[in-house]
UniProtKB/Swiss-Prot annotation:
Localization, UniProt: Cytoplasm; Nucleus
Gene Ontology biological-process annotations: apoptotic process; negative regulation of apoptotic process; phototransduction, visible light; regulation of opsin-mediated signaling pathway; retina homeostasis
Repeat region (TPR), residues: 178-211, 230-263, 264-297
GO molecular function, one term: peptidyl-prolyl cis-trans isomerase activity
Name listed for the protein in its UniProt record: Aryl-hydrocarbon-interacting protein-like 1
Functional description taken from the UniProt entry: May be important in protein trafficking and/or protein folding and stabilization.
Annotated keywords: Cytoplasm, Nucleus, Repeat, TPR repeat
Residue span(s) of domain PPIase FKBP-type: 53-145
One GO cellular component, as annotated: nuclear speck
Disulfide bonds listed in the record: none
Superkingdom assignment: Eukaryota
The keyword Nucleotidyltransferase appears for this protein: no
SMART domains found in the cross-reference section: TPR (SM00028)
Organism: Bos taurus
Amino acid sequence: MDATLLLNVEGIKKTILHGGTGDLPNFITGARVTFHFRTMKCDEERTVIDDSKQVGHPMHIIIGNMFKLEVWEILLTSMRVSEVAEFWCDTIHTGVYPILSRSLRQMAEGKDPTEWHVHTCGLANMFAYHTLGYEDLDELQKEPQPLIFIIELLQVEAPSQYQRETWNLNNQEKMQAVPILHGEGNRLFKLGRYEEASNKYQEAIVCLRNLQTKEKPWEVQWLKLEKMINTLILNYCQCLLKKEEYYEVLEHTSDILRHHPGIVKAYYVRARAHAEVWNEAEAKADLEKVLELEPSMRKAVQRELRLLENRLEEKREEERLRCRNMLG
């Protein structure tokens, strides 16, 4: 059936291939919609561009969350659960599809750790590319054309029925999520689950970074958020130390100290990372700085210096043995 009149949107035609069940779902703002889709050209062969079933994962979008391909929200909100429909969409609705497709393909290839959901922030950077890395998508980008979408609506969940990801929270919810994520990260760290703990800290950092972009740099609220971010980054670095990712620790701690040279914990954590990669002078310099800024940490510093000396002695002994074996 021609759904242009039903949808009241120019450049869309709908044909129902399989009827859905029940009434039209309540597509309220924040609802999560799960569906399979196949995208095809309007040529004689109906060339398939993308197919979520081939990837093995359905797609998710959040209603009202500025999804980049806005037409999909229009299409989905015309459907019932279990309905399968074919939509012909004119060029005015499909110009951005190549950029969306690129992101989805990269996810399917394991280049992005997230699931099949894409939001505006993730797509904005795509405009910087001259090529999308896929010939068929480059052609579509150069010469936009009408596309056919076959969509199967699987599920519609109200905001209270699923765990919302942090990028999908509003500002107040992000702020409320931070101490929860921080506490969960601490709990997981104590249990020795360092990978999971680092993920929680990262999530909290992303929330705060997002909030910080809305503040004027170096003003009171910005600095308050910056302090919280640095605390979380240093917790994240503690996880990296446990995972033996020492060079990343050096990168993060040095970045903090470039902007905030008085943070004692940053020197201490960086000293431990330097020690692990045999940067003796740098480790000792950082530990001296810790003592200068926080004399009460003398015992901890002395312990780290002993550990460093023991490790250096072990290394020197290994080198002596290696030389003997080479000469022997």
